[in-house]
A protein has these predicted regions:
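Extended beta-strand/beta-hairpin segments
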Residues: 1-52, 59-139
Length: 139
């Protein structure tokens, strides 16, 4: 299986603009620029897309890992925060904030252990060479 995304960029780094499109067309010539990446411009940016991909992948991996333990997942809400070091121009880490509804028969310690395993086995986690941290709110 292959997934495809395309990017087009025109102009200098600070004044130029670009568009990102995905095979599914969920992103279809979606605007990105220096301002959307490093300021508050309208559009997306590569780091935001990584965060979205990681949050989605982790949530699915957690659901699958819970099912592997014969546990049905309740609501899973994940926020991924990508840390960008502007001096080094590199991503230095990603933090996953997980909020999940109480699942009958699973205590918080077991759930946290399962979530940590899902973090490790998530396909996007495996693709990234940065520290990935996790905090869990199990209510």
């Amino acid at each position: 299986m292959k997934r495809i995304a395309k990017a087009h960029w025109n102009g200098t780094l600070q004044e130029g603009t670009g568009e990102i499109s995905t095979q599914s067309t969920v992103l279809n010539q979606t605007q990105y620029s220096f301002k959307t990446r490093f300021a508050d411009g309208i559009g997306t940016n590569p780091e935001e897309l990584i965060a979205g991909a990681h949050a989605g992948c982790f949530s699915m991996a957690l659901s699958a890992t819970l099912a592997h333990h014969n546990i049905t997942a309740g609501d899973i809400f994940t926020t991924a925060t990508v840390d960008l070091d502007m001096q080094a121009l590199s991503i230095t880490g990603i933090h996953l904030d997980l909020q999940a509804s109480v699942i009958e028969g699973v205590d918080e310690a077991t759930f946290t252990e399962i979530a940590d395993g899902a973090k490790t086995h998530c396909i996007i986690s495996k693709a990234l060479n940065v520290p990935i941290t996790l905090s869990v709110v199990y209510a």
